[in-house]
């Protein structure tokens, strides 16, 4: 027996335990799944053996990890769009502290020194988010018009144009400001199209992992951006900021070159009638022959979905408000998840990191950034594993709970020990050390859960017909909150100091309850199956037990997953 055949046989008979967050999700598992689905959705324990013979659906078999090297490399190249965004984020945080940048784009004191006001700093840094929000909504439709690949190439070119304008800026801050907006337009398009393309070419059982690579690339870009700023800080001329910008230009060109080797989305190819190309794309992603019956079966499922959407006519913006197919409910969920990602307070930690680290003797803000960047980047590797091992819901719930605990400790120690009674003397080294530890704990929890998973959830939630529109709006909510937090944090934190942490603590508590009651589990499902799950109205806290229609046994009770008359506290902690 070959290694691959043995692997598939072991997978078919493997007993995977149900790792549940609460008794509700554990006990709601029922005898519903077939052997193949059981391996994919380990929240379910039993299955109907008699159903195996009647199930005619041909499914692409799961293969050893080595079989997915090609598709993984392709998805990493698409995810490199996250690196472009992260590079910009990591470098701009250092630019506003560099002497040449301040001299060129700041204002002059009476004594001849230069400074950047809070308003100008906030605008230069945060206007990028507004550009991203607009770009995501306007440019995301390029993926529907010309394909995901070509759409990505176009938005990267727009990003490059913005970089050129910034590099060419001499001493007019508004020229640099305009360049930031244009670069933001490009990154906004990247943030929608990159996760979208990855989700549509990935095999379903590693889709969450591969989409999470987008966030991994963001953290890598941020970290290397910090390192580059550290390397150029000793210069006294425009090398300080023009070299990092020039490297950003080079990274964008690298991505454009790499995109030529990436397969197009099979769902887009089916939509435009290129069936043979769609079969080759699916075959490449799953390491099988294009003539494999399972490939044709998947193409037929996509075709059926596309044909149903075509019968309904062209998708309009008004259609996203439809409640009949649960599109509006999905949009609200996607927008909330993206908004709550910002409201978890990660940017608050990066803003206060310099202050806290200074209190214990680390006075170099560039060194502080590198420390935080290392923790953020290294932790994301753990998140890539967790998203497929434990699922989307469970990771988000764990993340919200653990970050709440970290935020409570961080804010409380800051208020009562580091700056007692609002006195900013930073006299307690023990308090500072404690806050550093919990800053790192917080970043670990964020990077493994709430950093990557909102991108995963949004990339697989919406039907193909309105996917680009819904993802653009959801992502725009993220950018807008990013702008608001980035712009107003210096003013708010200056007024209430570490009490600001309690605001984010409240947002994290709300996030926990929101995820439990409104975010369904989609691990191990195809994109078409996710669509069916939503249309059937399955309750999110019962969704781990849901089984696709073509895999159900004779005793499957769909109604049981759509109704729950228990009080909310029993839904969360009680047994059925």
Swiss-Prot record:
Belongs to the major facilitator superfamily. Sugar transporter (TC 2.A.1.1) family. It is found in: Cell membrane. GO terms for cellular component: cell periphery; plasma membrane. InterPro entries: MFS_dom, MFS_sugar_transport-like, MFS_Sugar_Transporters, MFS_trans_sf, Sugar/inositol_transpt, Sugar_transporter_CS. PANTHER family: GALACTOSE TRANSPORTER-RELATED, PLASTIDIC GLUCOSE TRANSPORTER 4. GO terms for biological process: carbohydrate transport; hexose transmembrane transport. Residues 88-122, 171-180, 229-242, 364-369, 416-437, 497 are extracellular. PROSITE patterns: MFS, SUGAR_TRANSPORT_1, SUGAR_TRANSPORT_2. Coiled coil: none annotated. Glucose transport is thought to be mediated by two kinetically distinct systems, a glucose-repressible high-affinity system and a constitutive low-affinity system. It comes from Saccharomyces cerevisiae (strain ATCC 204508 / S288c). Pfam families: Sugar_tr. Residues 25-37 have a biased composition (Polar residues). Residues 38-54 have a biased composition (Basic and acidic residues). The chain crosses the membrane at residues 67-87, 123-143, 150-170, 181-201, 208-228, 243-263, 347-363, 370-387, 395-415, 438-458, 476-496, 498-518. It is a multi-pass membrane protein. The gene is HXT4. This is Low-affinity glucose transporter HXT4. It comes from the Eukaryota.
């Amino acid at each position: 027996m070959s290694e691959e055949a043995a692997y598939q046989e072991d997978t078919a008979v493997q007993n995977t335990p149900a790792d549940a967050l609460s008794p509700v999700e554990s006990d709601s598992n029922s005898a519903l799944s077939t052997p193949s689905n059981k391996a994919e959705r380990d929240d379910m324990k039993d299955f109907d053996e008699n159903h195996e013979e009647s199930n005619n659906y041909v499914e692409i078999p799961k293969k050893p990890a080595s079989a997915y090297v090609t598709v993984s490399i392709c998805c990493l190249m698409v995810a490199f769009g996250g690196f472009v965004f992260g590079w910009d984020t990591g470098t701009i945080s250092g630019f506003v502290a560099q002497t040449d940048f301040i001299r060129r784009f700041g204002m002059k004191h009476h004594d001849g020194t230069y400074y950047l006001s809070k308003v100008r700093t906030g605008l230069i840094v945060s206007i990028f988010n507004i550009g991203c929000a607009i770009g995501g909504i306007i440019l995301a439709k390029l993926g529907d018009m010309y394909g995901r690949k070509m759409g990505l190439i176009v938005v990267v070119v727009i990003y490059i144009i913005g970089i050129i304008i910034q590099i060419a800026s001499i001493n007019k801050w508004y020229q640099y400001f305009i360049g930031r907006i244009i670069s933001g337009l490009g990154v906004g398009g990247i943030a929608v199209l990159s996760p979208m393309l990855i989700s549509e070419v990935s095999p379903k059982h590693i889709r969450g992992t591969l989409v999470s690579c987008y966030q991994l690339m963001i953290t890598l870009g941020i970290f290397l951006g910090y390192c580059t700023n550290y390397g150029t800080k000793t210069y006294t001329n425009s090398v300080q900021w023009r070299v990092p910008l020039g490297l950003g230009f080079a990274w964008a060109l690298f991505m454009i070159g790499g995109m030529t080797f990436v397969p197009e989305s099979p769902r887009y190819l089916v939509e435009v009638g290129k069936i043979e190309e769609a079969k080759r794309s699916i075959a490449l992603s799953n390491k099988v022959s294009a003539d494999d019956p399972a490939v044709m079966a998947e193409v037929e499922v996509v075709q059926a979905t596309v044909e149903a959407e075509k019968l309904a006519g062209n998708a309009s913006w008004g259609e996203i408000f439809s409640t009949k197919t649960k599109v509006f409910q999905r949009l609200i969920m996607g927008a909330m998840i993206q908004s709550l990602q910002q409201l978890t307070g990660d940017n608050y930690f990066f803003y206060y990191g310099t202050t806290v680290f200074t209190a214990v003797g680390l006075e170099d803000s560039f060194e502080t950034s590198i420390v935080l960047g290392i923790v953020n980047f290294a932790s994301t590797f753990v998140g890539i594993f967790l998203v497929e091992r434990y699922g989307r819901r469970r990771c988000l719930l764990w993340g919200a709970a653990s970050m709440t605990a970290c935020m409570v400790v961080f804010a409380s120690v800051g208020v009562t020990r580091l700056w007692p009674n609002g006195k900013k003397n930073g006299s307690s080294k023990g308090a500072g050390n404690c806050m550093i530890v919990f800053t790192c704990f917080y970043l670990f929890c964020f990077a493994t859960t709430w950093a990557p998973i909102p991108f995963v959830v949004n990339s697989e939630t919406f039907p193909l017909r309105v996917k680009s529109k819904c993802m653009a709006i959801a992502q725009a909510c993220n950018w807008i909150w990013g702008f608001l937090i980035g712009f107003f944090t210096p003013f708010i934190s200056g007024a209430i100091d570490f009490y600001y942490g309690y605001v984010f603590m409240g947002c994290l508590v709300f996030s926990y309850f929101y995820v439990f009651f409104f975010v369904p589990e989609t691990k191990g499902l195809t994109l078409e199956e996710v669509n069916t799950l939503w249309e059937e109205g399955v309750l999110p806290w019962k969704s781990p037990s849901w089984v696709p229609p073509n895999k159900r046994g004779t005793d499957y009770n769909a109604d049981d997953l759509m109704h729950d008359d228990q009080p909310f506290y029993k839904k969360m902690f009680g047994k059925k």
